[in-house]
Swiss-Prot record:
Residues forming the catalytic site: C306, R402
Organism from which the protein derives: Halalkalibacterium halodurans (strain ATCC BAA-125 / DSM 18197 / FERM 7344 / JCM 9153 / C-125)
EC main group: oxidoreductase
Ligand binding (NAD(+)): D249, G299, I300, G301
Stated name of the protein: Inosine-5'-monophosphate dehydrogenase
Length: 485
């Protein structure tokens, strides 16, 4: 150990470039799909970080519609996090198999509350045997002033249009158009409510053809958990809400508590997709895989708001960390996620080529309108608040267990709080990032991300090479949408 105290040199994104290769591939022809598990496939290799200024339900919905995956952060109560997951799963669906419903003896107030909370325009009404007896929509409530009125007095009861279980979206669309309605309840032979198809869901399928969805046609979503006292309860609530993947998210994934928690969750939920991290070595990757992780998340200290490497003196430069972990993970057929340090779309290409199956982004997404960070004005420009989960504010709110700390009065932060420029809708940012990925794959002559990972080579560059890579000897007069200094 002592003789090998100083290991190899560590490299990060600015230390390397990919070598261009002979190519018969155009950027528009490449596939940016990536497979994390048999049941979890992304249409773009981008995951939004489980940070309290990056991902809540609004972001998770938006990025899933783009083809990626959002991880709901854990700085909230168990009930609130489960509700956020439920909101994503209910945001759109080919067929809603467990629609909300009310009974005729409930009040209009209850319907208004339910419809407002989940932003839905109507709700089926069933009797005590779950048989459909009516439907209540915004039109029925438009002129109601007394919210204590019973639903039975205002709902539509006559000439209900329904369809049998098994009706396809195409068939449902024809029925909806024919009868000029927006909601189509699905019932069995006895009239029991079994599902719901809405015109909005059909429109969303057309509007967002690249959406990442589960086997039931619902958007996919993940959620972060730690190794705190409420982890078991939190995981149970998230699974009940329909979460697609659990991220066991800690600053040091190669610790006894994390390994034991991964093993315990795997034993409790054999079919649950588990992403575990963060790690930066091959040994840590192997131990997490053996404990039961389906996917390993790599990155200790590379994030723009992370100070772990400065405060604790710990870390491995990200390109080296990704490569080392991927070298081990490929022996087990397990994918890895490169988490942190990515500033440009070119860094995503490098992370994937170094061994990543997907990347997790924080700062590149925190400035979009769908992120939960507060918007503020500074020196005449719009910004959004962005902070590390190791910052004082985030740790005081609930993420201190991620850094294995307990005392709120004596926290030692490993992150900072700041602001980043406001970027507008997520779609515009994703368009630029995916466009950069496609361009990089075209230069390398690789049609798929698997080929990018297997058939590319890096070249190390000097400081002069890095300066040459950026715009130089010119004053930028118009900011590009995908490049800032």
């Amino acid at each position: 150990m002592w003789e090998n105290k100083f290991q190899k040199e560590g490299l990060t994104f600015d230390d390397v470039l990919l070598v261009p290769a002979k190519s018969e591939v155009l950027p528009r022809d490449v596939s940016v799909k990536t497979k994390l598990t048999e049941t979890l496939q992304l249409n773009i290799p981008i995951i939004s970080a489980g940070m309290d200024t990056v991902t809540e339900a609004k972001m998770a919905i938006a990025i899933a519609r783009e083809g990626g995956l959002g991880i709901i952060h854990k700085n909230m109560s168990v009930e609130e996090q489960a509700e956020q997951v439920d909101r994503v799963k209910r945001s759109e669906s080919g067929v809603i198999t467990n629609p909300f419903f009310l009974t005729p003896d409930r009040q209009v107030f209850d319907a208004e509350h339910l419809m407002g909370k989940y932003r839905i325009s109507g709700v089926p009404i069933v009797d005590e045997d779950q048989k459909l007896v009516g439907i209540l929509t915004n039109r029925d409530l438009r002129f109601i002033e007394d919210y204590s009125t019973l639903i039975d007095d205002v709902m539509t009861k006559e000439n209900l249009v329904t369809a049998p279980v098994g009706t396809t979206l195409k068939e449902a669309e024809e029925i909806l158009q024919k009868h000029k309605i927006e909601k189509l309840p699905l019932v069995d032979e006895s009239g029991t409510l079994k599902g719901l198809i809405t015109i909005k869901d059909i429109e969303k399928v057309i509007e967002f053809p690249n959406s990442a969805k589960d086997s039931q046609g619902r958007l996919i979503v993940g959620a972060a958990v730690g190794v705190s006292a409420d982890t078991d309860v939190r995981v149970a609530a998230l699974v009940e809400a329909g979460v697609d993947v659990i991220v066991i998210d800690t600053a040091h994934g190669h610790s006894k508590g994390v390994l034991e928690k991964v093993k315990a969750i795997r034993e409790q939920y054999p079919d649950l997709t588990i992403i575990a991290g963060n790690v930066a070595t091959a040994e840590a990757t192997r131990d997490l895989i053996e404990a039961g992780a389906n996917v390993v998340k790599v990155g200790i200290g590379p994030g723009s708001i992370c100070t772990t490497r400065i405060v604790a003196g710990i870390g491995v430069p990200q390109i080296t960390a990704v490569y080392d972990c991927a070298n081990e993970a490929r022996k087990h057929g397990v994918p890895i996620i490169a988490d942190g340090g990515i500033k440009y779309s070119g860094d995503i290409v490098k992370a994937l080529a170094a061994g990543g199956h997907a990347v997790m982004l924080g700062s590149l997404l925190a400035g979009v309108s769908e992120s939960p960070g507060e918007r503020e004005i500074f020196q005449g420009r719009q910004f959004k608040v962005y902070r590390g989960m190791g910052s004082l504010g985030a740790m005081e709110k609930g993420s201190k267990d991620r850094y294995f700390q307990e005392n709120n009065q004596k926290l030692v932060p490993e992150g900072i709080e700041g602001r980043i420029p406001y970027k507008g809708p997520l779609h515009d940012t994703i368009h630029q990032l995916v466009g950069g990925i496609r361009a990089g794959m075209g230069y390398c002559g690789t049609k798929t991300i698997d080929e990018l990972r297997e058939n590319t080579q890096f070249i190390r560059i000097t400081g002069a090479g890095l300066r040459e890579s950026h715009p130089h000897d010119v004053q930028i007069t118009k900011e590009a949408p995908n490049y800032t200094l």
